[in-house]
Regions:
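Long, acidic (Asp/Glu-rich), low-complexity accessory segments flanking structured domains
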Residues: 1-33, 37, 46-72, 128, ...
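Metal-dependent phosphodiesterase/phospholipase catalytic core, i.e.
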Residues: 34, 42-111
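Active-site-adjacent pocket scaffolds in enzyme catalytic domains
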Residues: 90, 94-166
Length: 235
């Protein structure tokens, strides 16, 4: 949606579709493989007179947010970024989130652990980047997103990210390649870094790792191995 006008044409062309897809499995298939964090971005389509909201990441989905939320009410989707949402649509989205997840939403609290979530029957934490979130105890404040070259952090949740992004010149000069090819070429380095991480409650701990094409590599088993190491240290 924020892309230049000429970019909006690319996904309609078969060649550029290879560079507009960053997953090869549907959400439920990813959950079955062990994925427990989904980065889902929400947008309202331009010139759409309805109140329907869609997921987007350069291109829009055909399924609406409400339908997807209902299907995933027993899972843990995480949304980040809004596009084209006014006050009324934010209110509608918040109402939908609260209606779908209901008592499974963990309210704002000073400290939260997985054990406390289980004991209370909570299954989802929603961080919402809008001032309306201050009016709802079931919504947590915005989780800041920092680039990887900014490592200093304040107390609380935060996200740091590295994006592998192809530009128009790269796409045109590599007609036989795809975004998946680019991502898979970086996986040996990424997995080596993941194996060095320490999950837990320490200041230097890392607890959520998100990546693309996770079912096409050893990413999920590598992350699960970190959890097993954490369990062995705590017993």
């Amino acid at each position: 949606p924020r892309s230049p006008l000429y970019v909006t044409f690319f996904p309609t062309h078969p060649r550029f579709r290879y560079f507009s897809s960053w997953i090869s499995q549907q959400t439920f298939e990813q959950l079955d493989c062990g994925v427990r964090y989904c980065d889902l971005r929400i947008a309202h389509r331009p010139n759409d007179n309805s109140s329907d909201l869609y997921f987007y990441h350069g291109v829009y989905t055909t399924i609406t947010v409400e339908v997807h939320q209902t299907e995933l009410q027993d899972s843990h989707p995480v949304f980040s970024h809004f596009q084209g949402l006014n006050q009324e649509l934010h209110t509608l989205l918040i109402s939908t989130i609260k209606s779908v997840f209901n008592s499974k939403l963990c309210p704002k609290t000073d400290a939260v652990t997985l054990r406390s979530l289980w004991s209370s029957g909570y299954q989802a934490i929603v961080s919402y980047e809008h001032n309306l979130a201050n009016c709802h105890t079931a919504l947590w404040s915005h989780i800041p997103y920092w680039w990887a070259n900014n490592v200093r952090r304040k107390r609380g949740f935060f996200v740091t990210g590295i994006n592998l992004t192809e530009d128009l010149k790269y796409i045109c000069s590599h007609p036989t390649e795809s975004l998946k090819d680019m991502v898979m070429a970086t996986y040996p380095t990424l997995l080596g870094w993941v194996r060095e991480q320490k999950p837990g409650s320490g200041a230097d701990s890392l607890n959520i790792i998100a990546a693309d094409f996770v079912t096409e590599s050893e990413f999920i088993p590598t992350v699960i191995a970190l959890n097993e190491n954490l369990l062995s240290r705590s017993t």
